[in-house]
Amino acid sequence: MSSRILIANRGEIACRVIRACHELNYICVAVYASDDKNSPHVQMADFAFELTGQGPAETYNNITAIICAAKATQCIAIHPGYGFLAEKAEFAAAVEDADLAFIGPRPETLKLTGDKVASTEAAKDAGLPVLGQSKLFSSFADCEKEAKKLGFPLFVKSPHGGGGLGCHRAEKEEQLQEAYTIASSQGQNLYGSKEVYVEQFVKSARHIEVQTMGDGSGKVIHVGTRECSVQRRRQKVIEEAPAQRLCDKTRNGLHEAAIKLMSTLKLRSAATVEFLVEGDEFWFLEVNPRIQVEHPVTELVYGVDLVQEQLHIAL
């Protein structure tokens, strides 16, 4: 009898994971809120389990409900997709504590990479080039002090920010108060902490990321680069693979840096290492420890199914 996998998500990524699971002969269990009962992922799955409650907090972000659904439907593993609980260390830990396989990085990896200051320190310790950056602080007085050390222009960032949120630029000292207020307020409202830090701003940088995959033992490979420099409000609009207009030295340097960091972290499953690139120089930016929205761009170019590789590694 085929094993069952619960997909703790909805929409496009749930359908994507279900397709990969079916191609490997796994049985898929979808979860859904009442509003999503007729959604495509529910129709595609072999079984579906309704999550009671209203809104994401009571359904797709409810750790206990997701694990209970997996146990009730006799699943052996949970794939989180992206968004919702995908990068929550406490969710990955709860899944493993329930004797289920978490199809993603280890809890400790998620905890580290979820903190931008801690992940930058890890990158620095691994020998990667990093941008000038302060420690965390929670007052404007400290912000002024750290900004003067770093110089303008700069970003004021929440260590837990993402998707362009919790991040605001100050071109000069007169803009620092506004940048601090916005970044710290968004951090408090979205992530429960008003702590922020300041980071060097590279005005003409390109945004290039490296797709990596690890087996959990320290063996990591790269699956090329993606260019995502075309953005609106610091959110990606267009992805291109592989990134163009890179000399061999820079491209190889990006690959090697990504592998070095993720090997140090003993990456399990898929993760993307993001860099800022200016000319032939590059700097570590952050790690996205999950399958990303844009992963099919890499799959089309390299002829690999990244979700199936996640399944092979986890199971």
Q: Whereabouts are the PLM-identified features?
A:
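ATP-dependent carboxylate activation and anion-phosphoryl transfer catalytic cores
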Residues: 6-24, 28, 47-50, 71-73, ...
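Conserved beta3 strand of the protein kinase N-lobe
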Residues: 133-134
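ATP-binding N-terminal substructure of ATP-dependent carboxylate-amine bond-forming enzymes
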Residues: 1-126, 138-145
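Acidic/histidine-enriched active-site and ligand-binding environments that engage anionic O-linkages
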Residues: 145-156
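A short acidic, helix-capping loop that chelates divalent metal ions and anchors anionic groups
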Residues: 164-166
